[in-house]
């Protein structure tokens, strides 16, 4: 009995480990299948854009181009047809000949130009974002400019004081300019001279009075 008991307990251990290994292998296989390359629609659009035929690319010519790129055409034949139909329905490809997947296909220039414009807009937005990141550096320069602005008022105060001294000195010049007023008053003196000159005219009759007195004395003596 003692020999059979350990055999029963040891048997379940490998049964529990085996399912975990199977799950990991399945996940790894699924990851490998997903990472096989770009989708069929991208390969078809590249092949059609590379062709220089004006009438468009036929289905057999498209398969040859895909096979040259290393794509397995025989296994993915149904995917190629579905990809062509979806691209025609979206408007990226235009079917010039035939119906369905059979026929010739060409790139839609309007759709291609519409896809190119959003890319240009994205690049413009990226360029606009770069200056936005560069702008915070400018405020640092302005901070330096503020320091220079603070220093300048000290220099400005000195010329202001010098200007005040000059203004204080200017009244002396004004006093010197005021002196000619005294010189202007001097012409009033000739008026006084004129008055003196007029006085002798008044004094002349006074000088005549003594003569009259002398005449009176002479008359009295004669009497």
UniProtKB/Swiss-Prot annotation:
Keyword DNA-binding part of the UniProt annotation: yes
Any GO CC annotation of this UniProt entry: nucleoplasm
Keyword Nucleus belongs to the record: yes
Region span, Disordered: 1-56, 91-223
Record SMART domains: H15
UniProt KW keywords: Acetylation, Chromosome, Citrullination, DNA-binding, Hydroxylation, Methylation, Nucleus, Phosphoprotein
PTM (free text): H1 histones are progressively phosphorylated during the cell cycle, becoming maximally phosphorylated during late G2 phase and M phase, and being dephosphorylated sharply thereafter.
Subcellular location: Nucleus; Chromosome
Transmembrane feature ranges: none
Annotated positions of the Phosphoserine modification: 2, 18, 170, 186
One record GO biological process: establishment of protein localization to chromatin
Residues annotated with N-acetylserine modification: 2
Chain positions found as N6-acetyllysine: 17, 46, 75, 165
GO-annotated molecular function: chromatin DNA binding; DNA binding; histone deacetylase binding; structural constituent of chromatin
Bias (Low complexity): 1-14
Phosphothreonine, modified sites: 36, 135, 152
Sequence positions bearing N6-methyllysine: 27
Domain of life assignment: Eukaryota
Biased composition (Basic residues): 20-35, 119-130, 137-158, 166-184, 191-223
Pfam families, A to Z: Linker_histone
Chain positions found as N6-succinyllysine: 34
Family: Belongs to the histone H1/H5 family.
Subunit (UniProt): Interacts with MSX1.
Physiological role: Histone H1 protein binds to linker DNA between nucleosomes forming the macromolecular structure known as the chromatin fiber. Histones H1 are necessary for the condensation of nucleosome chains into higher-order structured fibers. Also acts as a regulator of individual gene transcription through chromatin remodeling, nucleosome spacing and DNA methylation.
Protein name, as recorded: Histone H1.5
Organism listed in the record: Mus musculus
């Amino acid at each position: 009995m003692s020999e059979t008991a350990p055999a029963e307990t040891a048997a379940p251990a490998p049964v529990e480990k085996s399912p975990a290994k199977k799950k990991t292998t399945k996940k790894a296989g699924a990851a490998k299948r997903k990472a096989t390359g770009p989708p069929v629609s991208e390969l078809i659009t590249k092949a059609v854009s590379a062709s220089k035929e004006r009438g468009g690319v036929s289905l057999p010519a498209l398969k040859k181009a895909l096979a040259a790129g290393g794509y397995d055409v025989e296994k993915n034949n149904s995917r190629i047809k579905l990809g062509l139909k979806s691209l025609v329905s979206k408007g990226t490809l235009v079917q010039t000949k035939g119906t369905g997947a059979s026929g010739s296909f060409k790139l839609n220039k309007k759709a291609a130009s519409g896809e190119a414009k959003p890319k240009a807009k994205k690049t413009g937005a990226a360029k606009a974002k770069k200056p936005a990141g560069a702008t915070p550096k400018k405020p640092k320069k302005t901070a330096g400019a503020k320091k220079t602005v603070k220093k300048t008022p000290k220099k400005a105060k000195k010329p202001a004081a010098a200007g005040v001294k000059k203004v204080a000195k200017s009244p002396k010049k004004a006093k010197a300019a005021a002196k000619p007023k005294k010189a202007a008053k001097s012409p009033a003196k000739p008026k006084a001279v004129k008055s003196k000159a007029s006085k002798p005219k008044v004094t002349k009759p006074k000088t005549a009075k003594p003569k009259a007195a002398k005449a009176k004395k002479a008359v009295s003596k004669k009497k």
